UniProtKB/Swiss-Prot annotation:
The chain crosses the membrane at residues 10-30. It comes from Metarhizium rileyi (strain RCEF 4871) (Nomuraea rileyi). This is Cytochrome P450 monooxygenase ppzE. Keywords: Glycoprotein, Heme, Iron, Membrane, Metal-binding, Monooxygenase, Oxidoreductase, Transmembrane, Transmembrane helix. Glycans are attached at residues 319, 372.
Length: 392
């Protein structure tokens, strides 16, 4: 009798322990089947595993170490200009479609909630474009402060420093909006937005100027020829008129990554920037080496691209793995404005990089400031070894 009761309790324990797991497994399987058969994005090309689960992206991004961007490039070579890269997101690789996805004006584009999952508590997490419009309208309808600024009543402020976090702490925001965690989220967003990308771009530019003496000498000749020998740094407008310097900067921004490396340094240009069209379907008509294609992207689903994918496209940038500033110049040696529209280092549309002008100015200023400082040195590529190390 006791043995029967004992066996019954064991069966009950196993049932209670395994039943939830069995239900979850069945649900996951059915959900995966739905995603690759009846889901609105099921008709788009791409690996079935990527469409069925986020585990596919997790493997390349976490286990392999930030390698999904490189994998996406290979997926485009296999499947064409539009690829399904996870259950709820498409990725495109067509420069002519960029202005449709990353648009400005009345055509609304919201951020993907999946992309914003890592920005909990930050102002970056505000998704809706309607919310931004509301804020702008509210500020415009309050002209009192604008009047005081125009009349000079609020002009006596220190312009050398803008302590954002001190302003937040001293504001009238609710206490929960001024918590330590909230400030940490805001600091994280501000740090990731610009510091690493500028440093990586400048490191790439300086390395290639030293590793390629011909490019370095040509740039120095232009600077010595068109910029005065004064110790003062020329103005930004003067530097932007130098075609070869601008070409070097553009090439440095484009080629921040070496595809031959197994691990790539972090930079926002590697990230996908998903956009969601909330009020319209997006129609894609284009082609690739695999032939012409036409797709209708349903509204409410994310579609993205990344600067690294576009900048590695051999059809736009032949020999993309090489550092070649001449690609940005036309036959007359002037800036190639048509090619410049393919530079996506600062994204495009209504939510492009707010610090793009500061970043460009920094990238122009550093090489120009060294125009008189390298005349006593000669370098060859054999003397250099460029490595990226992660700081703990």
């Amino acid at each position: 009798m006791l043995s029967i009761i004992h066996v019954g309790w064991l069966e009950l324990v196993w049932f209670v322990a395994l039943y939830p797991f069995a239900c979850w497994t069945l649900f996951a399987v059915l959900k995966s089947v739905y995603r690759i058969t009846l889901h609105p994005l099921a008709k788009f090309p791409g690996p079935k595993l990527a469409g069925a689960s986020y585990c596919y992206e997790f493997w390349y991004e976490i286990v392999c170490g930030i390698q999904y961007t490189q994998k996406i490039i290979k997926l485009h070579e296999q499947y064409g200009p539009i690829v399904r890269i996870n259950p709820d997101e498409l990725h495109f690789n067509d420069i002519d479609f960029v202005d449709v996805v990353y648009t400005a004006g009345a055509r609304k584009r919201d951020k993907s909630r999946h992309y914003l999952a890592g920005f909990e508590g930050s102002i970056i997490r505000f998704v809706s474009s309607d919310f931004h419009s509301f804020l702008i309208d509210t500020r415009v309808k309050k002209p009192e402060r604008l009047k005081r600024v125009v009349l000079g009543a609020e002009r006596h402020h220190d312009a050398k420093d803008c302590p954002m976090f001190l302003e937040l702490l001293n504001s009238n925001l609710p206490a929960q909006e001024k918590s330590k965690q909230r400030l940490m989220y805001e600091a994280n967003g501000a740090t990731l937005a610009g510091s690493g990308s500028t440093a990586i771009a400048l490191s790439n530019i300086v390395y290639n100027l030293v590793a390629n003496p011909r490019i370095g000498h040509k740039l120095r000749s232009e600077l010595m020829r068109k910029v005065s020998a004064s110790k003062n740094l020329p103005t930004w407008s003067t530097l932007e008129e130098l075609p070869y310097l601008t070409a070097v900067i553009h090439e440095g921004l484009r080629s921040m990554y070496d595809p031959s490396k197994e691990r790539l340094p972090y930079d926002p240009s590697q990230e996908r920037l998903p956009r969601v069209a909330t009020e319209e379907e997006l129609i894609y008509e284009g082609g690739s080496a695999l032939g012409k294609s036409k797709y209708v992207i349903p509204r409410g689903y994310a579609i993205s691209t990344s600067a690294h994918v576009v900048h590695s496209d051999e059809s736009i940038f032949p020999n993309a793995s090489q550092f070649d500033p001449e690609r940005w110049l036309d036959r007359d040696g002037q800036r190639n404005k048509e090619l410049e529209r393919h530079l996506l280092s600062f994204s495009k549309g209504s939510r492009h990089c707010l610090g793009m002008h500061c970043r460009r100015a920094t990238c122009l200023a550093i090489p120009a400031s060294a125009r008189n400082g390298t005349s006593g040195y000669q370098f060859t590529s054999g003397q250099l070894e460029y490595k990226v190390q992660e700081r703990q």
